[in-house]
């Protein structure tokens, strides 16, 4: 699976999800906190640069293996 770079559009810590805007201009991708690859509290900040893979979830594409850049 290829890695894609993008920026966090928004992330709601209390709900544990948000969206990432890919750098290639494609449609925003859903991200769940469980896909964030970090220790401790898993969260993302608006505008943060990330790298991720896209998987096909039940409700459409979602981010997997999200890492901060």
From Swiss-Prot:
Domain of life: Bacteria
SUPFAM superfamilies named in the record: Nucleic acid-binding proteins (SSF50249)
Compartment(s) of residence: Cytoplasm
Molecular function GO terms recorded: DNA binding
Pfam families: CSD
Gene3D superfamilies (UniProt xref): 6.20.370.130, Nucleic acid-binding proteins
Transmembrane portions of the chain: none
Chief place where the protein resides: cytoplasm
Alphabetically ordered keywords of this record: Activator, Cytoplasm, DNA-binding, Transcription, Transcription regulation
GO cellular component term, pick one: cytosol
SMART domains: CSP (SM00357)
Keyword GTP-binding among record annotations: no
Domain CSD: 6-66
Matches recorded under NCBIfam families: PRK09507.1, PRK10943.1
Protein name in UniProt: Cold shock-like protein CspE
Species this protein is from: Buchnera aphidicola subsp. Acyrthosiphon pisum (strain APS) (Acyrthosiphon pisum symbiotic bacterium)
